[in-house]
């Protein structure tokens, strides 16, 4: 029977998933690194720099890994979660989610090719079409985020923003500064995030010069610009938070250390309001430390349990596929597979319960060879 629990507000900002959007080269990766420096130290801050992203290159001392495809990313995340003793990090970023989506799409297209023996024209056509390909991409993304979310690591998602035309339920069209991603992919991240921060540059333009007919003859001159981190949507800027009274916006200053502190203070203000906390900063930090210790102790166990459940489900799927292929495979392929099973000293039942996922996949690869010999 389900146990009823009473929710407690965590004072640890690492307990919340953060999504930060901004234009290219505005300083998103730098902001994350400085938040990490302030909260846990740079040596405990990890950037997962996806594919060709290189925001980490100018950040001296920032630990990073650079997975080039989905399998590398997936394997690293699973190892990081199942063996936390090997990874001394407290904060992790995925930089960027735009490239993460590209990797996930490539992965699903490859899975479609393996299953159907022919490529599909686009992700829309994968697995029979009707949106199944995109749904599979979103599931991949959601599963990885959930693993990290339930582990000891605090997660920051870094992405690009873009002005997009939108339309409300009444058909009214408007422009919005939102994610660069398609809405379905963006929502896979946004629904997991407790804080969505959107960085915007506000430019102050001097008066334009008009001719006698009122038409602009000379463009206005840029007087200055100011950058802000938005935590609340204003209709044009897409942002949001589960904290009711987090500030609408705070300055994104040229000094990255100050900008990071502005971000941290804004989140802490939201936490304090949600908990109706009125104590000192010292008391807040003690509670945050306590919540962080609880997260480290409990979270990895939950993530490991999830991974085991995923592996059990995958094992059933691979074993069923192995049995189907065995029925139609040629003699040469069957013999090669059987000899390998004997070499491993497995019985058929062992294959279903003890064989690793890699071993089952190896057998499937043998049986899928095209050069059948009857």
Where are these regions (language model features)?
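Conserved nucleotide-binding/hydrolysis micro-motifs of P-loop NTPases
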Residues: 51-55, 97-99, 161-165, 202-205, ...
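Structured loop/turn residues at beta-strand edges in well-structured enzyme cores
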Residues: 87, 151, 191
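Conserved GTP-binding G-domain of TRAFAC-class P-loop NTPases and closely related GTPase folds
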Residues: 167-303
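P-loop NTPase motor core
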Residues: 98-184
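Interfaces that engage single-stranded nucleic acids at replication/repair/recombination sites
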Residues: 2, 6-22, 26-27, 46, ...
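Generic beta-sheet signal
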Residues: 48-50, 158, 199
């Amino acid at each position: 029977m389900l146990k009823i629990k009473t929710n407690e507000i965590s004072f640890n900002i690492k307990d919340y998933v953060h999504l930060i959007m901004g234009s290219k080269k505005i300083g998103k990766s730098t902001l994350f690194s400085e938040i990490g420096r302030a909260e846990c130290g740079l040596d405990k801050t990890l950037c997962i720099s996806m594919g060709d992203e290189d925001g980490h290159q100018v950040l001296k001392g920032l630990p990073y890994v650079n997975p080039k495809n989905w399998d590398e990313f997936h394997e690293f995340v699973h190892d990081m979660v199942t063996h936390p003793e090997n990874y001394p990090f407290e904060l992790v970023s995925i930089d960027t989610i735009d490239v993460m989506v590209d990797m996930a799409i490539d992965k699903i297209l490859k899975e479609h090719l393996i299953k159907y023996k022919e490529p599909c024209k686009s992700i829309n056509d994968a697995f029979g079409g009707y949106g199944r390909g995109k749904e599979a991409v979103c599931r991949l993304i959601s599963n990885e985020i959930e693993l990290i979310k339930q582990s000891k690591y605090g997660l920051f998602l870094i992405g690009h923003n873009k002005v997009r035309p939108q339309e409300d339920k009444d058909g009214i069209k408007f422009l919005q500064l939102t994610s660069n991603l398609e809405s379905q992919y963006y929502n896979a991240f946004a629904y997991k995030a407790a804080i969505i921060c959107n960085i915007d540059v506000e430019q102050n333009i001097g008066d334009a010069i008009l001719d006698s007919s009122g038409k602009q003859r000379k463009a206005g001159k840029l007087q200055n610009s100011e950058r802000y981190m938005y935590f609340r949507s204003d209709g044009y800027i897409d942002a949001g938070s589960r904290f009711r009274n987090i500030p609408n916006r705070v300055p994104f200053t040229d000094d990255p250390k100050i900008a990071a502190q502005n971000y941290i203070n804004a989140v802490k203000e939201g936490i304090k309001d949600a908990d109706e906390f009125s104590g000192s900063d010292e008391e807040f930090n003690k509670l945050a430390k306590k919540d962080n210790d609880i997260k480290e102790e409990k979270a990895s166990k939950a993530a490991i349990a999830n991974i085991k459940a995923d592996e059990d489900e995958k094992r059933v799927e691979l074993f069923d596929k192995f049995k189907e292929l065995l029925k139609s495979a040629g003699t040469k392929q069957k013999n090669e597979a059987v000899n390998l099973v004997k070499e491993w000293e497995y019985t058929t039942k062992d294959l279903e319960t003890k064989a690793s996922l890699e071993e089952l996949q190896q057998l499937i690869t043998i049986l899928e060879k095209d050069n059948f010999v009857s």
